[in-house]
């Protein structure tokens, strides 16, 4: 079966920056986000062995969610000045791998991933789809053909979410995650939920009533204290759902055949040699005829005051991705 890897570029970019200490490339510019992003990308390629890869990024332009709710993501702090100057280098790495990436004003990377997953699911081919993201919003996309691989904050470990894993953690089916977050809110995006309705209560309500709309249709069947909270917060929750639900109909122009993953490893090697990431170069296939990547996390290279410190983490083989 063909395997598609969908990458949440912004999520991985931010996670890499905050997970790793300061690191400069050969030119002396900050590159810890580039290094960490590359770690996660190479690890995923080695484990999943995708037939196709696509990456998606946010743009700096407002989205339809900002228009709907002016305070959307308003509480997020100003990004560090050395973060976004690294983004062009991440995209250059993707270019070296031959990986296509999409970005579209008015939409977030998650919307693009949702659209791509849908388009591949309804194509003439059968795909196993893995979404690589640290954003739990994409859990709503999980179904029989779609799984989410979520890297840990240390970048070493990953958690694979299928429908079973989502239910074990939240007590809900993946498609209920939108309604769940509509009830609880999402502080990271500054989206309010219903005051007094926490994760446990939200999960219990959706286990009983299945959808947000059905819950409000049968609100009189809930305990009095819960009912009062639901009645007061109904409009808030319904508005939150419009923000939480990913758009699966973004207008994207592409041909599936152009997204096939077939890298020129010599080009990839030259890109990382140019950056001075020696430990990553060591993980690449040794010849253009080999496709074997070392899936473990490469060594950290931290350049401070012209000194290089290499710390090789212990290899953990227990988190190898299993696709069934």
Show where each model-derived region lies:
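Cationic, low-complexity basic patches in intrinsically disordered or flexible, solvent-exposed regions
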Residues: 287, 293, 313
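Short Gly/Ser/Thr- and charged-rich N-terminal loops/segments
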Residues: 293-305, 316-317
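Long, highly charged low-complexity segments
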Residues: 269-287, 305-307, 317-324
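Long, charged alpha-helical interface segments
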Residues: 244-270
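Intrinsic disorder
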Residues: 120-127, 252-254, 259, 291-293
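Extended two-metal-dependent nuclease catalytic cores across DNA- and RNA-processing enzymes
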Residues: 23-24, 74-249
